[in-house]
Amino acid sequence: EMIFHPYAFGESREDRISSIGSGFIIDERGFVVTNYHVIKNAEIIEIIMSDGRIFPARYVGSHERADIALLKIPSEDKFTPAFLGNSDEIEVGDWAIAVGSPYGLEKTFTVGVVSAKSREDLDETGQTHIQTDTAINPGSSGGPLLNIYGEVVGINRMIRSSSGASAGIGFAIPINYAKRVLRQIEQNVGQNIRPATLGVMATTPLPDHRKSLGIPNDAVGVLVYDIEPNSAAEKGGLRRYDFIEGANGLSVRHINDLREQVGLVGLGGVLRLKILRDTQEMELSIPLVEAAYQKGK
């Protein structure tokens, strides 16, 4: 367990603004995971270990939409990493343990249960979260959500509360999704992967749609029913009533699978789609553009 002190500087030392967040080590070489919003706009990041040691952190990269950042402790020491579990295996009612530094209170463990496995559409990103009634408060962000075996199943991210303090409705990023994001960050060292959009509306097709469009009953995917003008999808050749079967080599079983791949690729990346159009299988490579909710920010 560790605390982060990200500093943004004004014109003088007195203008220094600091914030506190949490994080955890994922590699014996000292690679550390936290939330992107914990270190956003920071010029200096300090890591305080549970044994009191303080290290300056080196920024490795981040993924803005996923709200994940990867840091490195600049030391030749070997560190003990957290064990990353399998968030697909959790069940509603399982014990959930949040570790962090709420309000700067170090080494705080709070206990609750998994309230929901795949809570969707909590914010503009559409990202899926684990919901828990485990107490998560300011300063807990970026810390691990553990199962009863001490395995990391999520990264504590945010709460739903009218007061700003825990009301028993907290949300964590599933660790399996985080693993995929971290691989993407490792391929874009030194960069912040910014949000992108495809610009389609899609849904699981009804039996009548399958029959009229020649989509096999056993085919898995989503049906495009509308495309935004001047979007990446339109410019990349995607059409209304295309049936999307895969994205970047992975099956698309639900619209959230497609959203996840768009998010992982990020702004400026290329999304490779496998589609069915008029009973013919095709592949499209679509350069992604900036997400509409990010424009002007």
Predicted regions and their residues:
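Short conserved beta-strand and strand-loop elements enriched in small hydrophobics
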Residues: I44-S50, A96-G100, G269-I275
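Short, well-ordered loop/turn sites that connect or cap secondary structure elements
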Residues: I26-D27, I39-K40, L84, I90, ...
